Regions:
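Acidic, Ser/Thr/Pro-rich intrinsically disordered cytosolic tails and loops
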Residues: 1-206
Length: 206
């Protein structure tokens, strides 16, 4: 068994090693979005798009088995946090783990990332820092950045989709909380808080 450092990893595999199954599923969702195969539905949910034959033929390569499993699940709108619990997606993640374990990147029996895998992910983060702009990046580069930098990359690279689809938390000014604190005599500085619902803009276009 090798230490896995010579294995060429796809973005969803990097995400699995770095942050676990939910991060891998997030990368798969963004992959499908960049291909035009899914879209945000009701606030905080995602659904598969109806793709015509011309769009289907135009795909350069098929999505990964994990992304294909996610796409199949999204025939019905779903929240991102629910996807990782879907039996088909859990099976796809389990199958994903097999070659990674064989390469020495996951340890038996619990299949947590090995020291070599964690070191490799850290090295990739240093080699691929977040850019100042999302422009000029290939889709593969975008996916790798999402795998390595998580929510910060989502807010930079696919801000509108990430916000509407519930992939990132919604930041908003809590006016009611400020008033409540004011009545208590507190002297808070910011008053901003994180919430999964409510208003807030999504940044620039994608």
């Amino acid at each position: 068994m090798s230490d896995g450092t010579a294995v060429r990893l796809e973005p969803h595999e990097v995400a699995l090693l770095g942050e676990g199954p939910r991060a891998a599923v997030t990368v798969a969702v963004v992959d499908l979005h960049l291909r035009g195969l899914v879209e945000a539905d009701l606030p905080g949910t995602i659904r598969a798009r109806v793709v015509d034959a011309v769009e289907a033929v135009g795909a350069v390569q098929p999505p990964s088995p994990l992304a294909a499993a996610v796409h199949g699940c999204l025939r019905v709108p779903a929240a991102p946090k629910a996807l990782v619990k879907d039996p088909g997606i859990r099976l796809a993640v389990a199958v994903m783990r097999i070659p990674l374990a064989e390469a020495g990147l996951l340890r038996y029996p619990l299949l947590g990332a090995t020291r070599a895998a964690r070191r490799h992910v850290r090295d990739l983060r240093h080699e691929h820092p977040l850019p100042a702009s999302r422009h000029g990046l290939t889709d593969h580069e975008r996916l790798l950045l999402v795998a390595l930098h998580g929510e910060a990359a989502l807010r930079l690279l696919v801000p509108r989709f990430a916000l509407r689809a519930g992939l990132v938390r919604r930041a908003e000014v809590g006016r009611a909380a400020l008033l409540k604190d004011s009545r208590r005599g507190t002297n808070g500085g910011g008053g901003a808080f994180l919430s999964c619902g409510g208003g807030g803009g999504g940044g620039g276009g994608e």
